[in-house]
Swiss-Prot record:
SMART domains: EFG_C
Disulfide bonds: none
PANTHER family reported for this sequence: TRANSLATION FACTOR GUF1 HOMOLOG, CHLOROPLASTIC, TRANSLATION FACTOR GUF1-RELATED
Function: Required for accurate and efficient protein synthesis under certain stress conditions. May act as a fidelity factor of the translation reaction, by catalyzing a one-codon backward translocation of tRNAs on improperly translocated ribosomes. Back-translocation proceeds from a post-translocation (POST) complex to a pre-translocation (PRE) complex, thus giving elongation factor G a second chance to translocate the tRNAs correctly. Binds to ribosomes in a GTP-dependent manner.
GO biological process per UniProt: positive regulation of translation
Gene Ontology CC terms: plasma membrane
Protein name, per record: Elongation factor 4
UniProt-listed InterPro entries: EF-4, EFG_III/V, EFG_V-like, EFTu-like_2, G_TR_CS, LepA_C_sf, LepA_CTD, LepA_IV
Enzyme class: hydrolase
Length: 598
């Protein structure tokens, strides 16, 4: 009965207790026995457990007997809370009619809480506020209720007070889900339409598609048609996660479950696509999701050049489960063969790098992250540049446009001054500032390349960890940008090039040259480290040579003898400098990030 189905997500900022609440709900509904129950059941990746974050959306179909005696099917769809994975949140919400908005009763409303809640409201989802961690001594429910009403603008007087850790208030949450979240709309007799909300690769059965059936009924043995690429597949198995996979005889309108149909390639089962039947196809596909574009790019190079093929294989395997990871081969004079990879943000980059090192045993050199720039040439052609070393000659460029984001920062009022100073220093333009109780909401326009560098770390340090940030892409905007090159012994190192704003280019060049001088190990000859904009050198530092005391064996004696030995040493150093190769350590490539973070 479609009337007795409830589809809901849990949305929250990181660390507000979302995964713990999901664990308690699963336990309460008997989804897993106490023996099988472990912390963060839905976070299946080791990395998710260690960092205490959710990266991929997971689901659980649970049966709950309400106090009115009716048995309900509750489909819980877990969502990530980090800004990098906000597109996963919008995907999960599109399969739901309701969402639990979990807010930490001691921390209060934070930036991602606001962003995810607005996403839910835009998608027409019923939002139920829940105050978690009510058992903490620092919990202040009245203040947090006022914040929810002021900042988000939804009624929160009736918000439930719970503690996911102790299990207090869980039955009230389930009753509220049944009472307030509407049942799914959909017709079982209509042609099949199912929305793919996630897909991943399983080494035994191929691609597993997680779908929300909107209309119709789906049974094993039926021939499926994917509406975007018109590909046909035979449906082999359908089922639900409870949270372990359980096969079913059918999935009908309103339900969330999985389809296995022997697809070998994840590109064929695109998230946001509509699945229908070959014999009785639907006339219109469902509204999908916008294609997610990478925001941050970095070069990944193997330390050993013979590991290149292994790195390609590892990236391809990772892409099977992470469709938002983009990569293409690239060559660097300094680092050899590697890949230019596109990520959703810095956390995504960090996680991909860690998974490559852990799961695939790779030793990597990662170049400093950059963003995409639009370059308009004199002939009117627009090219997108994600690698600074590929920037065309300045003489052929009409203008360079950089990506600008709208950042929403929530910060306690005592740190507002420091945060405003930080944003202004990063070329930010204030758009809005709103006081809400003890919190202040600042809205800034910021260039994305300033945010990518070290903005997040600095924001946390100037606010003692209390500020939270959420951002979305706004537009490409013309800016006065130049390419800063680093030369080591008069050789340009392409992997160290970066694009900076002209106003701060000289200072950046000086700081970078000084940093390089500290990091490059001393050799037997002098090394010149220069920062250049075009042909113009803006900074120079020398790494002094190590030298042997060739006069140690001369006790007294003639000055000409000493001079002869020194001249001989000097000639040897000169020859060495001409043929000598300078090893650049990995730390030097990351120095670009820490340049102004002294």
């Amino acid at each position: 009965m479609i009337q007795h189905i409830r589809n809901f997500s849990i949305i929250a900022h990181i660390d507000h207790g979302k995964s713990t609440l999901a664990d308690r709900i699963i336990q309460f509904c008997g989804g897993l026995s106490d023996r099988e129950m472990e912390a963060q059941v839905l976070d299946s990746m080791d990395l998710e457990r260690e960092r205490g974050i959710t990266i991929k959306a997971q689901t659980a179909a649970l049966y709950y007997q309400a106090k009115d005696g009716v048995n309900y099917l509750l489909n819980l769809i877990d969502t990530p809370g980090h800004v990098d994975f906000s597109y996963e949140v919008s995907r999960s919400l599109s399969a739901c009619e309701g969402a639990l908005l979990v807010v930490d009763a001691s921390q209060g409303v934070e930036a991602q809480t606001v962003a995810n809640c607005y996403t839910a409201i835009e998608q027409g989802v019923e939002v139920i506020p829940v105050l978690n961690k009510i058992d903490l001594p620092a919990a202040d429910p009245d203040r947090v209720i006022a914040e929810i009403e002021d900042i988000i603008g939804i009624e929160a007087r009736s918000a439930l007070h719970i503690s996911a850790k102790t299990g207090e208030g869980i039955s009230e949450v389930l009753e509220m889900i049944v009472a307030r979240i509407p049942p799914p709309e959909g017709e079982i007799d209509a042609p099949l339409r199912a929305l793919i909300i996630d897909s991943w690769f399983d080494s035994y059965v191929g691609v597993v598609m997680l779908v929300r059936v909107m209309d119709g009924i789906l049974k094993p043995g039926s021939k499926l048609l994917l509406m975007s690429n018109k590909a046909n597949y035979l449906c082999e198995e359908v089922g639900v996660f409870q949270p372990k996979a359980v096969n079913r005889e059918s999935l009908s309108a309103g339900e969330v479950g999985f389809i296995i149909s022997g697809i070998k390639d994840l590109k064929s089962a695109k998230v946001g696509d509509t699945v229908t039947l070959v014999d009785h196809p639907a006339s219109e596909p469902l509204d999908g999701f916008k294609e997610i574009k990478p925001q941050v790019f970095a070069g990944l190079y193997p330390v050993e050049s013979n590991q290149y093929d292994a790195l390609r294989a590892a990236l391809e395997k990772l892409r099977l489960n992470d469709a938002s990871l983009h990569f293409e081969p690239e060559t660097s004079q300094a680092l050899g063969f590697g890949f230019r990879c596109g990520f959703l943000g810095l956390l995504h980059l960090d996680i991909v790098q860690e998974r490559l090192e852990r799961e695939y045993d790779m030793d990597l050199i990662t170049t400093a992250p950059t963003v995409v720039y639009q370059v308009v040439l004199h002939d009117g052609k627009i090219v997108e540049i994600e690698n600074p070393s590929r920037l065309p000659e300045l003489s052929s460029i009409e203008e360079i446009r950089e990506p600008v984001i709208t950042a929403t920062i929530l910060v306690p009022e005592e740190y507002v001054g420091a945060v405003i100073t930080l944003c202004t220093g990063k070329r930010g333009v204030q758009e809005n500032m709103q006081y809400m109780g003890r919190q202040v909401m600042l809205v800034y326009e910021l260039p994305l390349n300033e945010v990518v560098m070290d903005f997040f770390d600095k924001l946390k340090s100037v606010s003692r960890g209390y500020a939270s940030l959420d951002y979305e892409f706004k537009e490409f905007r013309v800016a006065d940008l130049v390419k800063l090159d680093i030369l080591i012994n008069n050789e340009r190192v392409d992997a160290l090039s970066l694009i900076v704003h002209r106003a701060s280019s000289q200072q950046r060049g000086r700081e970078l040259a000084q940093k390089m001088r500290e990091l490059i190990p001393r050799q037997m000859f002098d090394i010149a480290v220069q920062a250049a904009i075009g042909a113009h050198i803006v900074a120079r530092e020398n790494v002094k040579a190590l030298r042997k005391n060739v006069l140690a064996k001369c006790y007294g004696g003639d000055i000409t003898r000493k001079r002869k030995l020194l001249e001989k040493q000097k000639a040897g150093k000169k020859r060495m400098k001409r043929v000598g190769n300078v090893e650049i350590p990995q730390a030097a490539f990351l120095a670009i990030l820490q340049v102004d973070g002294k």
